[in-house]
């Protein structure tokens, strides 16, 4: 028998590690080819630029590509890749060359073949050519439109067609291997595999070995489309690749753990060709050949790889070093099997079903025939809301999700495609495998074409005969799916035990022997049929299924058993308690007999032992056919019993402990109820606690130490800590009068009294002058207080002299400064200078949203010779403060900080040298362009001037609240895939606490609104507007802009940081989104300011009452309501007040994802970082007089729960970050604003692209 290429290459892989070549693009760049070089003679008159289209060089500059191939081969590469990464008609459409796809691949393969054969002849070592099939520039799993998560700009069939054309060219050019590489989206790779299988089935060419290489995009270990490495392997292993592995995105060191994972879950050989390290700030790769070779040699020595090479940034020098490094290393020995006896499925994550896997719940509610709610949503076209049905199933424990769109009123394939695409947009649903369920095979195919994971098909049968059965089975295998086979043949549905076994046995042999199905991918459904119908012939249906299950599992190795559970109890429709009990009893027995999985309503299955004993007996009698009257008895039971439920018994068992145990328990659990009486009981025990201070120093501080330890270990969360602090304050509050009385008695007796301090240290905290934001500072204060620090909180807008005086008065050990807005940074610098001048040499902590380690190290620390430390959040503050005050640790800690900050400073100054900026004049030439004359003209607002909104209805705002920032306040952050609201509730670590805090918030919100504790006021204004270069001029109503003076000007800042040379991205400025004065097109600009009043007063009242938790809660809710007010008002602006989107119909999710036209950027934020622009807003719209929202000297808004910004209506407007800018723009901006350069530099300090010191 003739040896195949697969045999030949596999023989080499068993002997040694093979070497793949390196980066093609990296080498092409070295030739510095011009547009003319790319065009060559043939394409000199082509209508589009071709520079950058590396693949065309195989036609226009074949000698260059040939030379690159030779260099890699001479460096030691066993395998070279064709220059065809983007040679599909899909990718080439960008260059207008899609018609050349076949030729491009054929020419590239010819060139590579020629080089390989020449070096084979020259060296006597056979070299191979791998045909590269890249990912294309489109994806099946990710929508290119944020607004339409179900939209795809490519189909599976289009990809198959494109990959077939590419593969034909490669095969005709003589490639030895087909390499599907840089897989960002596994669905695309599955289309490529489908195309190759099709070609080989059609005998287009003899089969070639297949190599598959995925791309893990970062340290999360996932592809761009969200799959883990193991899920990726599971999804593509049906193609039996000779090699599977990873390339691109990561350097070798970063790739190692993911290569290890790949090796553990495949019987294929493993290939690995990483980048030459990670890209630096200029996009270049810094890893030397020696470094890269060292890493890959480690891989080889540890038995991880069979093929190694290089991707981006690697060169023949890298490959030479790599080849030398691994030449004496033994190759990885692939295991004979992995996960033996397991069914392997995948969504974004792998799911293995093995001999010891518990019963698998296949969620049933995404079925238009089985769920009225789901059907109603799908029929109404409300797919996004229908996702909630899927989500609930997964949350309730469904490990696989059944999707069924079989309804005569639906276009089944279209509905299946759309819903599967929606699922792909939701990681918390897409993580589980899908079960594509339909009686119409066209619908099944439609579903399979959307799924990147390994699915289950439900179902096929022998109903239409063997030929139909085998045809469908082969297609399913080509998609890589597992299959459910119904016990149904040409004679009909099997109801008797022996017939069920017979039909399943016949199907098994057909699948395994004629189709080549892995037995582990076969699931039999022996038909769960309805019992309790009153018809005698139905009485044995449950027993027959159970007995058939046992025989099938015993006689057909590897298979699984499933069934649709709801069929069993269909006779008891509407009697949920009866149905759920029947399901629980049936499964209890069926699982014992071998049932592995079932289509169930996840979460509604009762535990067998929890079923009421009378109901349990009735269900047992019905299922096992023990009582002819079982159906009637069940119906009578249903009439006399409700659903019932277990009563939760509260226990106060902890109250039986000692006084110390009770105090500690109350503190840890945040229970206030008994704290005063327990504290008093301790106080009265004079023998144990002679003085009230002893109680604070003893049991109370011991309890708070436990709280601090649990918080530090991540076993308690911020809301719990704050509740503990509330209990502590109440206990201390009870003791204070007794301590003061004791102190007074001592003073009278002795004439003076020595102060005693039970605290670890004293810390003065303040939000700096001009800033009104203090939630973060307050939280830090509470956490420090819980850890035995005395906290002096000076509140907001605190002048420097007051901070320093308080530090002296209270003999502070540390000062902590907080700020949210950028001008606060300058105030912090000023405080540091004053501390140095006055020789107040105590540590200075810096925190707040606008602060950073870099700013602290570069701008603040050099002004002060004592420790200056940036503290990220409350959880870090305790560790920092403890080290700063520990006599044994503080000197070493400070020395470490000094060294760290010096490194940060040096890195910063080096980065300033490396940054490149376009001159402002050039940036303006590359501005964002809108063709104002051909675009629809801007809509005029319904009024010009301002409209004030008094006492706005807060209830209207509740639905617009974005809860994610609320949880951020409490430092509750879920981990993927449970980030954000409401997914955070599913997080194992913080979910429970998040739900508690959310419930507390709902309760407080209800009180705040119903009792009118807060008030919302705002203002909106519109004016005619025209852009003049980077500025926007506003005009009075009726004025002719070309002939009138503007009544106000908003000044813009333009991006200047140089973009990559290959980028065509414009350099944005907000003025780009307003029609220019010279265009003659009338345009408009809006502004708004909204606030929630009463928050500070309520917060202060709670604080005075010792209730820090409620104090912080009301501020967090005030901020959320203000943001919700801004969101709701913007919607009204779009639909009513400006009415440029009168027909907009968006849900809250759409608003959160910015799926609307127009933007509302705020001064002081990335699109216009200059806070002084607020002064123009306040003057123009008379905002303070209209609403009561005022500006502080640092231009923060007061009250703190306030939001303001500008309204832009253009459909092309978008948010962007100005980023760093250079001095020429600062000087230009200062001139336009009539400000000094120094003053502008002060306000724009954080975005200066140069150092002013």
Swiss-Prot record:
It catalyses: (6S)-5-methyl-5,6,7,8-tetrahydrofolate + L-homocysteine = (6S)-5,6,7,8-tetrahydrofolate + L-methionine. GO terms for molecular function: amino acid binding; cobalamin binding; folic acid binding; methionine synthase activity; methyltransferase activity; zinc ion binding. Transmembrane segments: none annotated. SMART domains: B12-binding_2 (SM01018). Residues 359-620 form the Pterin-binding domain. Zn(2+) binds at residues 248, 311-312. It is found in: Cytoplasm. Residues 6-326 form the Hcy-binding domain. Residues 911-1253 form the AdoMet activation domain. Residues 760-895 form the B12-binding domain. S-adenosyl-L-methionine binds at residues 962, 1160, 1215-1216. Keywords: Amino-acid biosynthesis, Cobalamin, Cobalt, Cytoplasm, Metal-binding, Methionine biosynthesis, Methyltransferase, Phosphoprotein, Repeat, S-adenosyl-L-methionine, Transferase, Zinc. (6S)-5,6,7,8-tetrahydrofolate binds at residues 370-372, 437, 458, 525, 567, 573, 579. Methylcob(III)alamin binds at residues 697, 770-774, 818, 822, 874. Residues 650-747 form the B12-binding N-terminal domain. Pathway: Amino-acid biosynthesis; L-methionine biosynthesis via de novo pathway; L-methionine from L-homocysteine (MetH route): step 1/1. GO terms for biological process: cellular response to methionine; cobalamin metabolic process; homocysteine metabolic process; methionine biosynthetic process; methionine metabolic process; methylation; tetrahydrofolate metabolic process. Its EC number is 2.1.1.13. Belongs to the vitamin-B12 dependent methionine synthase family. Catalyzes the transfer of a methyl group from methylcob(III)alamin (MeCbl) to homocysteine, yielding enzyme-bound cob(I)alamin and methionine in the cytosol. MeCbl is an active form of cobalamin (vitamin B12) used as a cofactor for methionine biosynthesis. Cob(I)alamin form is regenerated to MeCbl by a transfer of a methyl group from 5-methyltetrahydrofolate. Monomer. Dimer. Forms a multiprotein complex with MMACHC, MMADHC and MTRR. Modular enzyme with four functionally distinct domains. The isolated Hcy-binding domain catalyzes methyl transfer from free methylcobalamin to homocysteine. The Hcy-binding domain in association with the pterin-binding domain catalyzes the methylation of cob(I)alamin by methyltetrahydrofolate and the methylation of homocysteine. The B12-binding domain binds the cofactor. The AdoMet activation domain binds S-adenosyl-L-methionine. Under aerobic conditions cob(I)alamin can be converted to inactive cob(II)alamin. This is Methionine synthase. The gene is Mtr.
């Amino acid at each position: 028998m003739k040896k195949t290429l697969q045999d030949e290459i596999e023989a080499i892989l068993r002997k040694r590690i093979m070497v793949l070549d390196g980066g093609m693009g990296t080498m092409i760049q070295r030739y510095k080819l011009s547009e003319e070089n790319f065009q060559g003679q043939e394409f000199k008159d082509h209508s589009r630029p071709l520079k950058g289209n590396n693949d065309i060089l195989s036609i226009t500059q074949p000698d260059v590509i040939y030379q690159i191939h030779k260099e890699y081969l001479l460096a030691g590469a066993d395998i070279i890749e064709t220059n065809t990464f983007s040679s599909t008609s899909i990718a080439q459409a960008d260059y207008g060359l899609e018609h050349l796809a076949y030729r491009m691949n054929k020419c590239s393969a010819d060139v590579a073949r020629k080089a390989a054969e020449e070096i084979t002849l020259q060296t006597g070592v056979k070299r191979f050519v791998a045909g590269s099939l890249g990912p294309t520039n489109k994806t099946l799993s990710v929508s290119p439109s944020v607004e339409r998560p179900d939209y795809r700009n490519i189909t599976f069939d289009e990809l198959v067609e494109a990959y077939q054309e590419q593969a034909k060219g490669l095969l005709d050019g003589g490639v030895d291997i087909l390499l599907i590489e840089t897989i960002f989206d596994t669905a695309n790779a599955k289309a490529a595999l489908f195309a190759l299988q099709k070609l080989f089935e059609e005998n287009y060419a003899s089969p070639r070995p297949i190599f598959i290489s995925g791309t893990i995009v970062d340290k999360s270990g996932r592809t761009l489309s969200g799959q883990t490495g193991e899920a990726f392997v599971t999804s593509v292993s049906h193609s039996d690749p000779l090699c599977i592995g990873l390339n691109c995105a990561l350097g070798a060191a970063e790739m190692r753990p993911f290569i290890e994972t790949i090796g553990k879950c495949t019987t294929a050989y493993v290939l690995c060709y990483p980048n030459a390290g990670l890209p630096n700030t200029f996009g270049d790769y810094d890893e030397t050949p020696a470094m890269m070779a060292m890493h890959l040699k480690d891989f080889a020595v540890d038995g991880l790889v069979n093929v190694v090479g290089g991707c981006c940034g690697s060169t023949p020098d890298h490959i030479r070093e790599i080849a030398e490094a691994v030449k004496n290393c033994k190759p990885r020995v692939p295991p004979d099997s992995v996960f033996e006896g397991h069914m392997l499925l995948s969504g974004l994550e792998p799911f293995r079903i093995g001999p010891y896997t518990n019963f698998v719940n296949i969620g049933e509610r995404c079925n238009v025939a089985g769920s009225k709610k789901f059907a109603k949503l799908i029929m109404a076209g409300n797919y996004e809301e229908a996702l909630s049905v899927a989500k609930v199933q997964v949350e309730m424990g469904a490990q696989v999700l059944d999707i069924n769109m079989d309804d005569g009123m639906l276009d089944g394939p279209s509905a299946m495609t759309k819903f599967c695409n929606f699922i792909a947009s939701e990681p918390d649903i897409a993580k589980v495998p899908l079960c594509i369920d339909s009686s119409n095979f066209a619908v099944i195919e439609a579903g399979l074409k959307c799924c990147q994971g390994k699915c289950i098909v439900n179902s096929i049968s022998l109903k239409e005969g063997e030929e139909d059965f085998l045809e469908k089975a082969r297609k399913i295998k080509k998609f890589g799916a597992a299959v459910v086979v119904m016990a149904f043949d040409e004679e009909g549905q099997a109801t008797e035990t022996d017939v069920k076994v017979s039909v399943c046995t016949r199907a098994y042999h057909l699948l395994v022997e004629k189709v080549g199905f892995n037995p582990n991918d076969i699931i039999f459904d022996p038909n769960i049929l309805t019992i309790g119908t009153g018809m005698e012939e139905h009485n044995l249906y449950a027993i027959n299924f159970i007995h058939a299950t046992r025989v099938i599992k015993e006689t057909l190795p590897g298979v699984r058993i499933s069934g649709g559970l709801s069929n069993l109890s269909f006779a008891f429709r509407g009697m949920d308690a009866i149905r759920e009990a029947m399901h629980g009893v049936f499964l209890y027995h069926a699982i014992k007999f071998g049932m592995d999985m079932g289509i169930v309503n996840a979460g509604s299955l009762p535990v067998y032992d929890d079923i009421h004993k009378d109901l349990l007996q009735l269900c047992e009698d019905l299922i096992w056919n023990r009582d002819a009257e079982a159906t009637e008895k069940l119906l009578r039971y249903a009439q006399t019993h409700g659903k019932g439920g277990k009563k939760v018994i509260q226990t106060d068992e902890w109250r039986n402990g000692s006084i110390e145990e009770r105090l500690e328990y109350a503190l840890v659990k945040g229970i206030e109820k008994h704290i005063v009486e327990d504290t008093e009981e301790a106080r009265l025990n004079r023998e144990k606690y002679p003085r009230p201070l002893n109680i604070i120093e003893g049991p109370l501080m011991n309890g708070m130490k436990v709280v601090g330890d649990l918080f530090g270990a991540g076993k308690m969360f911020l809301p719990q800590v704050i509740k503990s602090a509330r209990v502590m304050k109440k206990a201390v509050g009870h003791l204070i009068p007794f301590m003061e009385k004791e102190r007074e008695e001592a003073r009278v007796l002795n004439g003076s009294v020595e102060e005693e301090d039970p605290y670890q240290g004293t810390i003065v905290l303040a939000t700096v002058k001009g800033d009104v934001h203090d939630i973060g500072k307050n939280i830090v204060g509470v956490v420090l207080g819980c850890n035995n620090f005395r906290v002096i909180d000076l509140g907001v807008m605190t002048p420097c002299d007051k901070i320093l005086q308080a530090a002296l008065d209270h003999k502070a050990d540390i000062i902590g400064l907080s700020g949210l807005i950028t001008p606060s940074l300058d105030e912090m610098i000023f405080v540091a200078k004053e501390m140095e001048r006055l020789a107040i040499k105590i540590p200075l902590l810096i925190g707040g949203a606008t602060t950073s380690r870099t700013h602290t190290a570069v701008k603040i620390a050099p002004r002060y010779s004592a420790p200056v430390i940036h503290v990220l959040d409350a959880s870090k503050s305790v560790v920092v403060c403890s080290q700063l005050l520990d006599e044994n640790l503080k000197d070493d800690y400070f020395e470490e900080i000094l060294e760290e900050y010096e490194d940060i400073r040096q890195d910063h100054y080096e980065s300033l040298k490396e940054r490149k900026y376009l001159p402002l004049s050039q940036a303006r030439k590359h501005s964002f362009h809108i063709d104002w004359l051909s675009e629809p003209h801007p809509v005029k607002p319904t009024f010009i001037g301002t409209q004030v909104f008094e006492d706005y209805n807060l209830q209207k705002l509740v639905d617009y609240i974005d809860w994610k920032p609320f949880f951020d306040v409490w430092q509750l952050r879920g981990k993927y895939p449970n980030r954000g609201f409401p997914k955070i509730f599913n997080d194992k670590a913080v979910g429970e606490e998040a739900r508690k805090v959310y419930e507390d918030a709902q309760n407080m919100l209800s009180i705040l609104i119903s009792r009118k504790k807060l008030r919302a006021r705002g203002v909106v204004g519109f004016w005619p507007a025209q852009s003049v270069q980077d500025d926007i001029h506003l005009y009075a109503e009726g004025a002719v802009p070309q002939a009138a003076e503007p009544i106000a000007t908003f000044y813009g800042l333009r991006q200047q940081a140089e973009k990559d040379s290959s980028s065509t991205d414009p350099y944005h400025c907000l003025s780009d989104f307003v029609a220019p004065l010279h265009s003659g097109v009338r345009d408009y600009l809006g502004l708004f300011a909204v606030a929630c009043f009463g928050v500070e007063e309520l917060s202060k009242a709670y604080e005075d009452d010792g209730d820090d938790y409620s104090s912080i809660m009301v501020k967090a809710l005030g901020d959320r309501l203000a943001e919700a007010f801004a969101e709701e008002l913007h919607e009204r602006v779009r639909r009513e007040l400006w009415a440029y989107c009168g027909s907009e119909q968006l849900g809250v999710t759409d608003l959160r994802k910015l799926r609307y036209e127009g933007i509302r950027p705020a001064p002081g934020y990335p699109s216009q970082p200059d806070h002084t622009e607020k002064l123009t807003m306040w003057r123009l719209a008379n905002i303070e007089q209209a609403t009561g929202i005022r500006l502080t000297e640092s231009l923060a808004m007061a009250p703190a729960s306030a939001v303001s910004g500008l309204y832009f209506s253009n459909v092309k407007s978008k948010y962007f970050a100005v980023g760093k800018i250079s001095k020429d723009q600062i000087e230009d901006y200062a001139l336009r604003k009539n400000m000094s350069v120094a003053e502008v530099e002060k306000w724009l300090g954080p975005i200066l692209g140069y150092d002013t010191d």
